[in-house]
């Protein structure tokens, strides 16, 4: 029973870490990355469709993304979707290819993005701690029902705390890497 709780806790903490890493990967750093455009939806036959499903996105150089739209009739809709997104990008169409130049980040914008990343990291830590709390409550319930001894309870809580510390270290490492990436010129 305790092993099941531990495995479930580890899986849930891993998901919290994945969500955090996914969120910070979408924060623009000044370097071109196709993941920047992940959140963009394009109106396609009356349905909002992810841009990735409608175009091939490649990094042309460190500051430019190139999109090759599969259906040429969608080029205008793709450009409009990129322009109206909150990313502050201005695509330009050159025949079959849409180029998206990424403007350099100002110092002020970099600091704002670091604040956002730190807030995301704190949210990730809170999520991991909530998973720890849930796991500890399950262990306490087992102790209360006399299914485990107090020694097993203490050992389980120590294991859960070690897991929590390990995942919070991973969040902190990802945060430090993203901050470094944002401050690189």
From Swiss-Prot:
InterPro entries: Ribosome_recyc_fac, Ribosome_recyc_fac_dom, RRF_sf. Its main location: cytoplasm. GO terms for molecular function: ribosomal large subunit binding. Transmembrane segments: none annotated. GO terms for cellular component: cytosol. Keywords: Cytoplasm, Protein biosynthesis. Belongs to the RRF family. The keyword Isomerase does not apply. One of its GO terms (biological process) is cytoplasmic translational termination. It is found in: Cytoplasm. It comes from the Bacteria. Responsible for the release of ribosomes from messenger RNA at the termination of protein biosynthesis. May increase the efficiency of translation by recycling ribosomes from one round of translation to another. It comes from Yersinia enterocolitica serotype O:8 / biotype 1B (strain NCTC 13174 / 8081). The gene is frr. This is Ribosome-recycling factor.
